[in-house]
């Protein structure tokens, strides 16, 4: 099975953290490609392919049957994390949705899943919101990556439970503490692109005293300072 570059990056991040006895739930699994791949590659022992809609879950069941993984990949219908309450899940992956929706899913049931020690998350937008919520609620960022799939850039973030009192900054939430430190090429490309977009916004604002102009100008300076600090 060949995964998309986005899913392949997520799988690689999971592999770095998983042991053979870990059980993973993939939330919003769509076709079930990720959990099937992880089990097939012996990265994890058991996976739960979870989705809120019958259609995607039916596609997952087809993938599971085609790969003859019925004993190791279990499809579950339900909203967010609810289907895995009471299951021996130790890792959770959520990808392909916005950051606000992702946080809503985590807020609803994560507190009931004390055995979950690792989250592997890929938000399409608003990654800062995911970082801020989890880092303020007993989780730390232990790994980050950025991947290009077709014309889109995606950030993958790995969180672990922690008792440590780690002081993250707003810059950590916005840019990612590890990505900001390492600044891989795709990270630079993402934020250089953002600067171009914001400069076009500046050019469209005639009133330089307008709050939007001041805010956009401040954002540009911040991004350029981050990029020049490496």
Describe the residue ranges of each PLM region.
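Conserved class I S-adenosyl-L-methionine
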Residues: 20-30
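Conserved SAM-binding loop of SAM-dependent methyltransferases across substrates and taxa
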Residues: 31-44
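Conserved SAM-binding motif I beta-strand of class I
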Residues: 46-51
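Short SAM/SAH-binding signature in class I
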Residues: 88-96
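Conserved SAM/SAH-binding beta-strand->alpha-helix loop
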Residues: 53-55
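Class I S-adenosyl-L-methionine
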Residues: 3-8, 82, 100-230
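S-adenosyl-L-methionine
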Residues: 1-19, 36, 58-87
